DNA sequence: CGGACCGTTCGAATAGCGGGAACAGGCTTT
DNA sequence: AAAGCCTGTTCCCGCTATTCGAACGGTCCG
């Protein structure tokens, strides 16, 4: 498990995914457009596009290529096979019904938080998150709950790798401040997010840990700042959340 | 738009996706396992795996590699950007609430049907379909509804490409029989599925067409055969469905 | 009618992919 | 303990397959 050994990547594969990324970002792109963006010969891009299209990974509409629904198949497969999904999903639905707010299940992967499932109550606001979204762990409640319950060396490594970019002016960007913050989260067992990712939005997040105590994901409740405050925010929601994550942890251990 | 011109695929990219496919199918695989399966040298697989892992597309857990949630990000992106999704989604939810059965939104891509969104009523059975699932168009109600409303040359081409494989003993496998069947669907505007994809499951599907009358997708209602029969199946559900698809078509035209 | 742009095809040169052999480490077996 | 066998990993070399640029054949626009 060598960490950062000098490994030479397969460049052809990289360009293939570069093309996919450009097509994704542009929400459909043409051959010359892609070639210009990536500074490749048109013929090269053409051959790649045709290869990906033959595999069904890109779809050609006229002269523009789009990403195909094969990625949806792959993605849903990943989600369904994840240990947390089956167990956490019903709990997330339950919490959404009880709190009438937006509830998310987030997992950690490669040092970032990934939203794998969300449910909303009747009166919940539409958050800006969506399924599959990747967010730096220090920027939101669920992420901080996860980060606080990782081994120290992993925490430091993640901070080294991604830094502490700000999402709003409330986002924690100072490393020492974050370390203290994480210590507090570790002590009480859950995390708050007060407009640190979206202005006007508060959230509470609690970690889901495995047998050895390491976080593998988290569940969070998010809602408008003027509704999530006072005892509801500091007492009631944490209680609900901890009850849910505790149950999830038990179910995880017996599956 | 040359159809089947002699184009040489980029083989390196193909092997990369072969590896991804093996990892997906095996639900996590090790280097030697993949190498054996694809008859490649261990060193080759290793280099590819490390490349994909560096890009975040594979995740390494110990010595086994898994597909990462990046595919979820790509996949959800594809779905959200699809014209039909935003428009059809609320209608699908509505139909599920009204009928108390499983309702699916299916789109056509590359000649196959892709389930992009599903909603279920309280009493609906769990169908065997899942988001992202790809099904041959002749095998189910939504697919037949789409197939019937494609240009003739596309229909023939799709049948040529994929054949008429059976899912149950009721699946239509005779080409002439299917042609007649499609003609009937075209006349009345919607399709039935009586245990043609899953034994014990019936369904009704209606196409969503664009301005020129070509189907771009379909919506279907599915449920147990003993519940979906008689006038409910032949009158009420088709009415509901046509009302919904009609509305979707109008909304599509004005977006 | 002509120019400018597109996607597409072709051939040729070389960069980089793939393979095999050797290494290091962990686990089981003797 | 130690020998054996299985990993994943690294290295380097040869040959193939990728890349590029130029030329072709469309189509759209002026």
What are these regions (language model features)?
Chain A
Residues 92-100, 104-107, 249:
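Short regulatory alpha-helical segment in sensory/regulatory domains of signaling proteins that mediates
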Residues 206-211:
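Sensor-regulatory modules in signal-transduction proteins
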Residues 215:
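Glycine-rich acetyl-CoA-binding "A-motif" of GNAT/NAT acetyltransferases
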Residues 105-110, 118-119:
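Short hydrophobic alpha-helical segments used for membrane anchoring or interfacial signaling
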